[in-house]
Amino acid sequence: MAVAKKRKVKKNIPEGIVYIYSTFNNTIVTISDKQGNVVSWCSAGVLGFKGSRKSTPFAAQNALADAAKKAADCGMRKVEVKVKGPGPGREAALRALVSTGFEVSRIYDVTPVPHNGCKPPKRRRV
């Protein structure tokens, strides 16, 4: 006898947190509820951008739009935004979030800043 397949229960999550982690090579977007449970996530690499195309603002915009669509299916409308990292996708991802129709309540910059910790990598000579 075959095992009965469980139906996926549709969650109703009205508020959440959007984490935008933007590095020089990629942009990763994670959307969670207020408790920190991940609702959806996406990155530029998952969408098929490879190599230097992952670090473009356009790739970050598409990554956020994809993650936001999945979160909107769960009923999410109001979000807080936490942005981390110095990458080129920061502002593009924020603009994409506003255009998807989410109500943004707060924007935090949580980029870690060292209090003179580790020595940074040496300058590139090309």
From Swiss-Prot:
Molecular function terms, GO-annotated: rRNA binding; structural constituent of ribosome
Gene: rpsK
GO CC annotation, single: ribonucleoprotein complex
Complex and partners: Part of the 30S ribosomal subunit. Interacts with proteins S7 and S18. Binds to IF-3.
Top-level taxonomic group: Bacteria
Name of the protein described by the UniProt record: Small ribosomal subunit protein uS11
Pfam families the UniProt entry points to: Ribosomal_S11
Family assignment from sequence similarity: Belongs to the universal ribosomal protein uS11 family.
Organism of provenance: Desulfotalea psychrophila (strain LSv54 / DSM 12343)
SUPFAM superfamilies: Translational machinery components
